[in-house]
Amino acid sequence: MSNSQSKKIFGLIGKHVDYSWSPLIHNTGFEALGLPCVYTIFNIPSPEMIGDALKGSRALGIAGFSVTIPYKKTVVPFLDELSPEALSIGAVNTIVNDNGRLLGYNTDIDGFAAPLLPMAESIRNRPVCIFGNGGAALAAVEAFRLRFNPSSVLLVVRDTQKAEDMLEEYAYRDLVTIHAGREIDQPACSKLIRDCRVLVNATPVGTAGRNDHIHSILPTGHGLLHDGQIVYDMVYNPPETPLLAEARAAGATVIAGIEMLIAQAARAFSIWTGQELPVDLVRKTVLAAIEKSEG
């Protein structure tokens, strides 16, 4: 058997995910630790093909997957068991093939929480605010509930009905209040946001190559950013987003999206291999690759 044939195969399930940094992250870790593993990309064109893809993975002995949008919920019915975190929000981003049984995990929750943990005491019993109503926002809601015990979670969204639908089966719905983004101009809503200990951007606004701007969801002129806040942007490319630049200028503590990207990958890496991802090396490698891609 050749060396390539003896390697465990891991991969990313998604749609149009050739841009992903996940192969670089995991292959850097595998190589650094001398593990006989390789990570690749599995572009799946439609949700109707997910069941066949996972069935085939059992037969082929693929060791595990990462799962990204739009399939984090789609994969759930085809798995044999879910972790408590995955069950709580009905979404999976990590799969392990355990001798033909497919086990689903959600590492977005711990990945989101990781860079906030050193500031946990300052978050407890304080309100927090999340912009967005997709899976990333729900993972952030659950991370706050499980790890930080905030007094409340303010969800600021463009589509309030979509947010209501997302939270319909969430067991801790009473923790969350929903506001439409257009309400930010109203003094009462502005005050709620200013009083939040943490502000999170869980939308793709600010991502390199997009035409929109953070001011489309967080208008200026309301003093919403200040030095008593932690501002967390899940966008990781560019590493310093417009939101983070404005928050830094306002004196806020900032957390870049690359920290969540690497932390959730590190948790998946540990689930798959039982070893710790060399986080410092991976961060340096990914930042260098992002800088090169921008050049």
Swiss-Prot record:
Pathway entry: Metabolic intermediate biosynthesis; chorismate biosynthesis; chorismate from D-erythrose 4-phosphate and phosphoenolpyruvate: step 4/7
Entry annotation: catalytic residues: 72
Annotated EC: 1.1.1.25
Keywords assigned by UniProt, alphabetized: Amino-acid biosynthesis, Aromatic amino acid biosynthesis, NADP, Oxidoreductase
EC class: oxidoreductase
GO MF: NADP binding; shikimate 3-dehydrogenase (NADP+) activity
A Pfam family of this chain: Shikimate_dh_N
Biological process per Gene Ontology, one example term: chorismate biosynthetic process
InterPro entries: Aminoacid_DH-like_N_sf, NAD(P)-bd_dom_sf, SDH_C, Shikimate_DH, Shikimate_DH-bd_N, Shikimate_DH_fam
Reactions listed under catalytic activity: shikimate + NADP(+) = 3-dehydroshikimate + NADPH + H(+)
Binding site for NADP(+): 132-136, 234, 257
Annotated binding of shikimate, by residue: 20-22, 68, 93, 108, 236
Gene3D superfamilies: Leucine Dehydrogenase, chain A, domain 1, NAD(P)-binding Rossmann-like Domain
Cysteine pairings via disulfide bonds: none
Family: Belongs to the shikimate dehydrogenase family.
Subunit comment: Homodimer.
Database matches in PANTHER family: BIFUNCTIONAL 3-DEHYDROQUINATE DEHYDRATASE_SHIKIMATE DEHYDROGENASE, CHLOROPLASTIC (PTHR21089:SF1), SHIKIMATE DEHYDROGENASE (PTHR21089)
Described function: Involved in the biosynthesis of the chorismate, which leads to the biosynthesis of aromatic amino acids. Catalyzes the reversible NADPH linked reduction of 3-dehydroshikimate (DHSA) to yield shikimate (SA).
HAMAP family assigned: Shikimate_DH_AroE
Descriptive protein name: Shikimate dehydrogenase (NADP(+))
Organism encoding this protein: Chlorobaculum tepidum (strain ATCC 49652 / DSM 12025 / NBRC 103806 / TLS) (Chlorobium tepidum)
Classification of source organism: Bacteria, Pseudomonadati, Chlorobiota, Chlorobiia, Chlorobiales
Gene name for this UniProt entry: aroE
